[in-house]
């Protein structure tokens, strides 16, 4: 393989580039923005994906903090469950981490170095015998043996493979934010979620004196014409004290809007010499806590297949055969998870009772599935 073109400099594209460079395979990333991802958000990366980053030499401790405990509060703010994520993660080889997305993006970008081209916006792709071609907004073009689309849920490259396909929007929206202080009420290395009918909220320790928090409504898209904080105050009752503390520490321009949309059962993920990975192929809800992990797992597997010396058709076919079931399962689980955490009073009562009385073996299996990606 003489050259791999990557469209998109997000987590998937950067991880793939580092993985290929480690194998000595030439790569170039074209990222449409002329800066690193500049909105301060964060996410949880489970143990199996952290191991991939660590194997690439990524110092994850510089961009986040290990997660030890995940605490869930159900109806009326009552505590219902604590999951010892840290101990279960370490049983499988690495901690799970709460990560500052901006810091991780900046770190990975610097590790990739000059092979990342910023301000290079792909507007179309094509494929000829033995080559994939990308055309850019400034009229220039680039070509490689293969082209890998890592350009996210609103992928431009997807139009080449599946013209007219759009995200399935779920009618859910909210905000996520990172604040430059640690809340006294939040224990170190802990994430808390608060589940109410029609809305869930969460807060997590990012380390380095930072906290991420988020709110997601089940059947409501936030209005741009109304105060963000007022929309939360008016629709989340009772408002958890932890979330109130977050609101008090956050300017509204720090609250990044989110909407839930996904792509289930899209197939194939490739055409000729062009392949999609990450959210370009299998976008999932931002409230699932699994999208970044799936992208990292995609990148690691694809790099191994490219390095194996197989033919391009075999690489693409084998990649989809291995990853599609897992990716579709993540999407289905994210839908179920949003429904579970925001269900109505009666179902919420049943849910809370089940979590409070769940056998330890069952709880451990749930945690094991999360930290291993199964």
What positions do the PLM features span?
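Conserved N-terminal helical subregion
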Residues: 4, 46-178, 220-232, 373-374
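Short, flexible helix/strand-to-coil boundary loops that buttress conserved ligand/catalytic motifs
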Residues: 40, 56-57, 64, 83-84, ...
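A structural signal for isolated positions on well-ordered beta-strands in alpha/beta enzyme cores
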Residues: 5, 28, 212-214
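C-terminal auxiliary extensions adjacent to catalytic cores
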Residues: 355-374
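C-terminal domain-closing interface element
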Residues: 341-360
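Conserved mid-domain beta->alpha element of the FAD-binding
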Residues: 7-22, 26-33, 148-149, 175, ...
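Conserved N-terminal glycine-rich FAD pyrophosphate-binding loop of Rossmann-like flavoproteins
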Residues: 34-51
């Amino acid at each position: 393989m003489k050259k791999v073109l990557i469209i998109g400099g997000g987590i998937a594209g950067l991880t793939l580039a580092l993985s290929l460079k480690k194998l000595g395979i030439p790569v170039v990333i074209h990222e449409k923005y002329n800066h690193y991802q500049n909105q301060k958000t964060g996410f949880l990366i489970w143990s199996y994906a952290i191991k991939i980053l660590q194997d690439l030499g990524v110092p994850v401790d510089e961009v986040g903090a290990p997660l030890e405990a995940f605490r869930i509060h159900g109806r009326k703010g009552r505590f219902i469950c604590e999951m010892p994520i840290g101990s279960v993660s370490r049983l499988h080889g690495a901690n799970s981490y709460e990560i500052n997305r901006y810091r991780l993006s900046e770190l990975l970008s610097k590790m990739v170095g000059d092979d990342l081209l910023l301000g290079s916006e792909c507007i179309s792709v094509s494929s000829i015998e033995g080559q994939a071609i990308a055309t850019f907004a400034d009229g220039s073009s680039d070509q490689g043996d293969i082209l890998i689309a890592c350009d996210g849920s609103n992928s431009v490259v997807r139009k080449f493979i599946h013209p007219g396909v759009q995200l399935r929007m779920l009618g859910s929206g909210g905000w996520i934010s990172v604040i430059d202080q640690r809340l006294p009420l939040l224990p170190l290395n802990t994430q808390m979620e608060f589940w109410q009918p029609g809305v869930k909220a969460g807060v997590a320790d990012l380390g380095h004196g930072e906290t991420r928090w988020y709110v997601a409504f089940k059947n409501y898209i936030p209005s741009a014409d109304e105060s963000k904080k007022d929309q939360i105050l008016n629709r989340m009752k009772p408002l958890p004290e932890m979330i109130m503390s977050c609101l008090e520490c956050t300017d509204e321009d720090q609250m990044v809007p989110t909407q839930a949309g996904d792509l289930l059962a899209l197939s194939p993920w490739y055409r000729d010499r062009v392949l999609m990975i990450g959210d370009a192929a299998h976008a999932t809800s931002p409230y699932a806590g699994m999208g970044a992990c799936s992208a990292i797992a995609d990148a690691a597997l694809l790099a191994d297949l490219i390095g194996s010396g197989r033919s391009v058709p075999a690489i693409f076919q084998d990649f989809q055969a291995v990853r599609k079931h897992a990716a579709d399962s993540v999407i289905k689980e994210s839908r179920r998870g949003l429904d579970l955490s925001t269900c109505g009073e009666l179902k919420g009562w049943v849910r809370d009772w089940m979590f409070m009385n769940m056998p330890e073996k069952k709880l451990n299996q749930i945690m094991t599935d999360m930290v291993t990606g199964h």
